[in-house]
Amino acid sequence: MYKDKQLYVAHSANGPIHIIGNMANRHGLIAGATGTGKTVTLQVLAETFSQAGVPCFMADMKGDLSGISQTGGLSKFIEKRCAEWGMDTTTLQFEGCPVRLYDVYGKQGHPMRTTIEKMGAMLLARLMELNETQTGI
C-alpha cells in the first residue's frame, strides 16, 4: 500500500512497517527457506512500488508472480491476519498491476533477447528441460 510517499510493506507487533519511497535501493535480494514467504514478500513489494509509479523487474522462473496482474480479493486468511493486527479491512483496495511477461521463445509473452552465455545455468537448464544431474554438469 502506497500512502504519504511511504511504502507499507509489512506489519509487526509494534505496528506497520514502511519504506520511505526515495530511500529504497534499486536492487534487492529476498532469500529464505521454502515456505518462508519470499514470493509473497516480492509480490507485496512489487505491488507497492507499482502503486508508487516505480517500474519493477522480477525474474520469476516458476511463474508464481504472474498473478500480480489480477485483482485480488478479501479472503478468510486476510481477514484473520488483519484482525490480528487491528487493521480495518473496509479500507483495503484490491487492484491488478501492470505486467509484461517476457518469454525467451517469444511465443507466450514479450520476446526476451539475450545470449546463452548471459542466461546462467538455472535458466538454461529450465529451457532445455534438464534434470538435476544434467544441470550440475
Q: Each predicted region: which residue ranges?
A:
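Glycine-rich phosphate-binding loop of nucleotide-binding enzymes
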Residues: 1-97
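Helical/strand "switch-coupling" subdomains that flank nucleotide/phosphate-binding cores, especially
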Residues: 83-137
